[in-house]
């Protein structure tokens, strides 16, 4: 016999379907963001490794829907930067930075020459016959790109290097005059903990941190969790590859 909860759920679904809608369970991380932004507008968002702003991007919908998000999208690959400019050309609240975030303290970068660069390992733009997601593969760590050999057997022949502008996280945040960062998101193919560690250099700790852990070693991932827990964050895995952290 169906439970009362099951009966109520089906009844509610039928009601909304009649009006052309459907009910979808919102992921916990999204509920946390939605609740926070109601009382914190503008909401300050920094995304490191924005790629093209669409593919596998959990925050694209937020940016499209919400004019209250003051955002900095940081991306080192030129073709992706061009795409970001095209998508958000009419959005003054969204800034695009053609740069990579280096390792080490952002405070050091504040006094470093603007000509600092980072060596980026990426799949060549001229590569043919590869999966559609291959152009997302760009990292400061060559071994992370090469590790996709199980799905792209000849990936070694397509790996190339590119020198890209390199800045510190705090340097970029300061450049755009953000008084704080509410959400820091990073997806940099294995370089993510190096970026997360730079939250100590920001004006205050971000309320939320969302980072890709899939390409971190078990030791690095453990260290990243300890780092966040020591700063009073609660953490949980969003899926098999990402972690969401929220200040207590």
Positions of predicted regions on the chain:
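Phosphate/nucleotide-binding beta-alpha loop and adjacent structural elements of enzyme active sites
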Residues: 1-248
């Amino acid at each position: 016999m169906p439970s009362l909860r099951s009966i109520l759920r089906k009844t509610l679904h039928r009601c909304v379907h009649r009006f052309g809608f459907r009910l979808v369970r919102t992921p916990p991380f999204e509920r946390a963001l939605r609740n926070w932004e109601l009382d914190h507008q503008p909401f300050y968002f920094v995304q490191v490794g924005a790629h093209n702003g669409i593919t596998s991007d959990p925050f694209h919908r937020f940016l499209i829907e919400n004019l209250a998000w003051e955002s900095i999208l940081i991306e080192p690959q030129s073709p992706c930067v061009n795409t970001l400019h095209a998508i958000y050309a009419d959005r003054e609240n969204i800034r695009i930075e053609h740069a990579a975030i280096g390792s080490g303290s952002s405070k050091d970068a504040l006094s470093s020459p603007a000509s600092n660069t980072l060596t980026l390992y990426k799949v060549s733009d001229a590569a043919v016959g590869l999966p559609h997601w291959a152009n997302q593969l760009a990292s400061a760590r060559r071994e992370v790109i090469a590790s996709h050999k199980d799905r792209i057997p000849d990936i070694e022949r397509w790996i190339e290097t590119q020198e890209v502008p390199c800045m510190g996280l705090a340097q970029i945040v300061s450049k755009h005059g953000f008084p704080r960062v509410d959400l820091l998101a990073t997806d940099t193919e294995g370089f993510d903990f190096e970026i997360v560690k730079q939250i100590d250099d920001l004006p205050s700790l971000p309320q939320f941190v969302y980072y890709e852990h899939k390409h971190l070693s078990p030791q690095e991932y453990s260290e990243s969790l300890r780092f966040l827990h020591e700063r009073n964050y609660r953490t949980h895995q969003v899926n098999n590859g990402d972690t969401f952290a929220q200040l207590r």
